[in-house]
Amino acid sequence: MKLHKFYYSVSICIFTALFVCLNSFAQNTGKRVIKGSVVDANTGDPIPFATVSLKGTTVGANTDDKGRFFIETSIPADIILFSFIGYQTESRNISRGTEQIINIRLRLSIIELDEVRVKPRRVNYKNKDNPAVELIKKVIEKKDFNRQEVYNYLEFKKYEKIQFAISNITEKFKQGSQFIKFRFAFDNLDTTKRIGNTVLPVFIKESLSDYYSQKDPKAAKEIIRAEKITNLNEYFDNKGVSGYLNYLYQDINIYDNEILFITNKFLSPVAKSAPNFYRYYILDTLSVNNINCIKLFFEPRNKQDFLFHGNLYIIMDSSYAIRKIDMGINKNINLDWIQEISITQDFDQFGQQGWLLSKEEILIDFGIIKNSLGLYGQRTVSYKDYKINEPLSAVIFKGPEKIERFVPSANSAGFWESNRYVPLTKSEKGTYTTIDSLKKIPEFKKKMKLLTLITTGFYDLGNIEIGPVESFYSYNSVEGSRFRFGGRTTTGYSKKITFDAYAAYALKADLFKYNAGVTYSLTPGTIYQFPVKSIRLNYQNDTRIPGQELLFTQPDNLFLSFKRGPDDKLFLNKTIKAELLNEFESHFSYLAGYSFTRQSPLGNIHFTTNDYSSYTNDISHINISELFLNLRYAANESFYQGKIYRFPFPGKDPVIQLKTAFGSKSIYNDYDYIRLQLNLSRRYYVSVIGYTDIMVEAGKIIGEVPYPLLFIHTANQTYYYQKNSYSLMNFLEFVSDQYISLNIDHSFNGFILNKIPLVRKLKFREVVTFKVLYGSLSKNNNPDYNAELFKFPTDESGIPLTYSLDKKPYVEAGVGLSNILRIFRVDFVKRFTYTGHPNVSNHGFLIQFRFDI
């Protein structure tokens, strides 16, 4: 019995072993290899990412970038299929042989594409084993070879046209009583710009440029040869408007990782990290101007991020160059005043070289409410006459990246007709004549003067203008109600010389103040035309709050009259100043001059070397006589020239400023010293998470001076947010003779709040701020160690109100929301150090009027 069981077990083992061996042999003899290539039947070009599959099975593969495929399988099948979007599917019979080579030529399908957006299924989207992702990775891998910066030298000509039109013009709007005298303007309506929408062109700017670039050392230069613009220079800074449009419509290089567009940084769909932020879908293959391309649709993974959506048309060869782009942005992005954006770029091959940009069109629909009255903007750029790798002289690249060198005939009647690359439409031509006609109508002039008053604070009376109106009334606790009235001459009086003056009276202090100045232009242009070269002489008898330094705001301002904490310290300055301003096209400038100030204390400020709490003055005033030199460099800066201030647009380059002053008894100063200040500021864009403004400043005083001549650190006791001031520091709270400071202001552009349902509909934008100040005061300049110096201010009990920063830095930080009601920013700020000082606020809210896109 046992022997029987033994033979039975052995038989089972032998049978099993034979079965496994035979089965393995059968599998090995059935395995086969199929390989080959897939190419375009018309051009012979390889077709990457084509699908190769065995009919009736799940076995298959995709062709590589050279159109090659390889399949190894033991699954029986008789037919192999070859397919790719836009091509006719082909099939071939296959045998049971061990290796077969099949080369297939696919023919294009004839497909009529409707004007619809294809929305592919998004179920279980993943990057792994995704042909669309593999394709975009090839584009990214090759992009450094396809961008124009790859060439050692590059030269081309460029024609740019920017135009704006009032959109959604209705019959009711046209019949409005306010337009009775302007009805002729509606004869220039255009219905071709936007399908189903009537627009009224109101602005057009054209320019012709020569562009040069070199790879090593990296340099670029654009020389504007001619420019034509609708002229409203009496009311607006035409150059400033042009500069803002260039800032708004910056050149788009799709091969860059990040694209600066409408003041925000967007991640490019061909950025190195793009597959982590975008989804990609291969939609079709089609011919774009006789070039076979793969149409690749892309969209953001998160619709609230600063990303594009649209189509890339990728050339079907080993270059993986981009033939065409059409893209826009998602309506859920936190962009203000914008309803819709469309961007189109076409690339052409010039000679046997690579694919270079030939045409670009950007359309922006500005508006608050969709389908209501808005503003429609269009930028069209055409490129031609490319010269590649023809050596260029180094002289070309000297100076700023963009300069004007107008050809003599640029303003002649026939110049633009023969030189613009694309003819103007009838309505575009009419824009120039319509604006010229409107300027002759008295009613239009009145409305423009009113608009100028609202936007600039000045009202034009012809040869003079009065303002700024926001300074006509203000209040402080020392002077009480303060009334001021002033104005200046306009270019209607003289383009070379400008007079300005104001008079002010304070009720409580019973003081009369005034200012008078004259500025003379040393160039044929006015004192407002860059580059400015001018001399100025000015006399001022007025008060100043110690430590208040305002940006783009007059100190006599109704909105700055509301303050927290005591506001009882003023200097009364009687100053005569002579200065020379010299600006260069490179955006380097210097301001040199001499000033003499007789400074007196006012309110609860006293000049005493004894007990400050006695509130008496040992002397009535000090004499401050200085020679000064200020240097500034802001490479490639563009700006809007306002009536008082110059408003720069943030650029890619840092702004560097050095201020120096020399005071000496030999020039009738009461003290001997040298004062130095260095300031560096720059904006950094951080792709989808916004941008950061950083400012670093340092200062040093060499000499022995009283506290009015020390660095009185910039404080802000108002409720209006000032970026360059310390929001919770009191006036005259801190002084130093040397310091260094860091100011960081970051805007997230809604990156966080856009992820929160409902909240994102408000389109708020998060901001964070951080300000730190390190300072010190030497014993020579500290009244506690030097009895000859004025005592620091105290209250009546002798408690100090002014301090040095020797022990620790001053630190404050805040969080806030901008884009509230589209125009306001509110910050909550907390003070972290020196919180025990008298009369200080350790936290608070501040507001700012701020216009962002």
Residue ranges of model-derived segments:
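Bacterial Sec-dependent N-terminal signal peptides
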Residues: 1-35, 52, 112-120, 527, ...
